[in-house]
Structures are given as structure tokens and as C-alpha cells.
């Protein structure tokens, strides 16, 4: 706890600076970050996702991506001292009327598909929009670094939303449903599942991609209506999330239909603004070929 207070205090001294000043810092450290932080992974991901693009085009995407990544870092730190008025001015939402209409019709649970696109941490401020007619929550996977994990739990929860550990998702959602309160739950669903959790593959960015199906799977069980969040960046320091209806009753459509549709929408967004997606992770390290080999060999443990 003492170490966390020191860590948070250090970040607070950065956070008190206005965002325009923090963006100067962002531009400065970006010069170094783009030369040493997971550059091989980023370049390989871009090469295989966009084989039709020239090397110069991919280099341009890489450059813009690292600027976005560094901006995200300082924007997230800024959350420590950003006022309610400022976050509501900088992070706006469209389609909230569609959510309220369905809540008014009696559906208490709403699942919002999100991605590692733009600044996904600021989306937690959506809870301010629900002060009179609902609440929000977000599914999260604990980070390996305890200090960072505690920080982001605090940052996400400061707007009044509920933090739900990934492994407790279904149980907690059943508890929330019993409360009888309107809930919007955000699912960031573009991460790579573990071997034991792979059940479905989709064509995504020129790869046969293992995907997470948990959001749709749970929505079918609890009759949560589902939407897709389309993130845009009108200008530096400002984001907008359009909430697009997908399906009011997920169990009424064939299984994995909404998962497939989510990745179709996300791929279109990435192709439109590739620099806004998170390219630093080995998204395609678990291939379908290797998965089939493991299935045939009866390998169940994680690596």
C-alpha cells in the first residue's frame, strides 16, 4: 500500500499538467518508444495484416500508432486529476437513446462490445451518462504488475462503474441482474483467448483468428441486448463512441453470429484508422493449425 501511494503520487505530479503540455511530453518520449518498445511485434503484425500495403505505408501506420500509444499513456495518467466536466467534454457518446429505449422496454442488461481502439479507458466515463437511469460496468483482466493493476482498477472505478474480474463475469452478471437495475457492461473482446478457451475462429485482418466468444455466450443466457462501440478521434484529446445496435435478443440468432459481426465491424474500423488499434501484442500467436494439433494430441494445459 505504501509503495502504491508513492507510485500514485509520482503519477499525480504528472497528471496535474494540462493535456496540451502532456502531449508535448508524449511527442518527446514517442521518439524513443517507437525505436525500442515491441517494434518487431508491431512490424510483423502490420506486415501480415496488410500484405497489400507498401513498406512505406506500413511505416507510416507504425509511426502514427506509436503516437497514439504514447498519447494514451498520458491521457490515462490525466484521469487521476481530470474533472467530471472535462472528461465529459472530451469523451462523448452517441446512441445512448437506443440504450434507454430498450431499458424502458424492460431489458435490464446491455452488453457493449469494445476494443483496444483509440482510448478505451476513457469509455468508463459513460457511467456519468446513466446517473438517472442506470449504471455501467467493465470486465477486466488483472494486470501482472500489481501497482498498475491497482491503478487501473481505481481509474476505471472513479466514475462509479462496477469493475468485474474476467473469471467472475458470469456470476457477477447474475448478481447484477437480481438488483433490477439497468446495467451497461463493456466487453473488450479483441484479445487472444488462452488455448483452453479457444472455441471459434474468424477471418480477421488476413488471419484465421482465435477469438473470445464470452460476451455473446453470456448474452444468450441472460437475454442482454448487444451493441457495438465505434470509436473515433475527432481531434487530439477528444474521442467519440457511437453505440450501434446489433441484436436485442442474442439467443434468437445462430450461435457466434454476433461474435462474427463484431469482428467484421472492428476490421472495418481498423482498416479505416489502423493507427488507432493496439498492435503491440502477439495477437496471432495461437494459430488454428497449432490448435488442431493440440486437440488431436489431447493437450489441455496452458503454455
In which residue ranges do the predicted regions lie?
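Non-catalytic C-terminal accessory region of glycerolipid acyltransferases
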Residues: 59-63, 101-104, 154, 167-303
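Catalytic core of membrane glycerolipid acyltransferases/transacylases, capturing the structured
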Residues: 107-167, 194-203
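A broad structural signal for alpha-helix termini and local helix breaks/kinks
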Residues: 17, 50-53, 131, 222, ...
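Membrane-anchoring hydrophobic helices of lipid-metabolizing enzymes
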Residues: 1-114, 119-120, 149-154, 160
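Short, charged helix-to-loop "capping" segments that act as catalytic/coupling loops
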Residues: 34-36, 94-100, 104-109, 126-135, ...
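Active-site metal-coordination segments of metallo-dependent hydrolases
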Residues: 40, 145-146, 208-210
Amino acid at each position: 500500500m505504501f509503495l502504491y501511494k508513492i507510485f500514485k503520487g509520482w503519477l499525480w505530479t504528472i497528471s496535474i499538467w494540462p493535456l496540451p503540455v502532456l502531449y508535448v511530453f508524449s511527442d518527446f518520449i514517442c521518439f524513443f518508444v517507437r525505436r525500442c518498445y515491441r517494434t518487431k511485434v508491431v512490424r510483423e503484425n502490420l506486415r501480415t495484416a496488410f500484405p497489400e500495403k507498401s513498406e512505406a505505408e506500413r511505416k507510416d501506420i507504425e509511426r502514427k500508432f506509436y503516437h497514439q500509444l504514447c498519447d494514451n499513456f498520458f491521457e490515462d495518467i490525466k484521469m487521476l486529476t481530470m474533472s467530471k466536466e472535462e472528461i465529459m467534454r472530451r469523451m462523448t457518446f452517441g446512441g445512448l437513446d437506443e440504450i434507454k429505449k430498450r431499458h424502458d422496454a424492460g431489458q435490464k442488461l446491455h452488453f457493449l462490445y469494445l476494443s483496444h481502439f483509440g482510448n478505451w479507458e476513457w469509455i468508463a466515463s459513460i457511467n456519468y451518462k446513466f446517473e438517472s437511469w442506470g449504471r455501467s460496468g467493465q470486465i477486466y483482466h488483472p494486470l501482472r504488475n500489481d501497482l498498475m493493476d491497482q491503478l487501473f482498477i481505481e481509474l476505471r472505478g472513479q466514475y462509479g462503474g462496477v469493475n468485474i474480474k474476467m473469471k467472475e463475469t458470469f456470476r457477477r452478471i447474475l448478481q447484477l441482474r437480481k438488483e433490477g437495475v439497468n446495467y451497461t457492461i463493456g466487453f473488450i473482446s479483441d484479445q487472444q483467448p488462452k488455448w483452453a478457451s479457444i472455441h471459434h475462429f474468424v477471418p480477421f485482418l488476413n488471419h484465421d483468428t482465435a477469438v473470445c466468444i464470452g460476451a455473446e455466450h453470456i448474452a444468450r443466457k441472460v437475454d442482454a441486448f448487444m451493441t457495438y462501440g465505434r470509436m473515433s478521434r475527432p481531434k487530439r484529446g477528444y474521442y467519440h463512441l457511437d453505440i450501434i445496435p446489433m441484436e436485442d435478443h442474442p439467443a434468437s440468432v445462430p450461435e457466434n453470429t454476433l461474435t462474427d459481426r463484431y469482428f467484421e465491424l472492428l476490421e472495418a474500423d481498423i482498416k479505416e484508422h489502423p493507427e488507432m488499434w493496439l498492435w503491440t501484442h502477439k495477437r496471432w500467436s495461437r494459430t488454428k493449425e497449432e490448435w488442431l494439433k493440440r486437440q488431436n494430441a489431447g493437450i489441455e494445459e496452458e503454455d
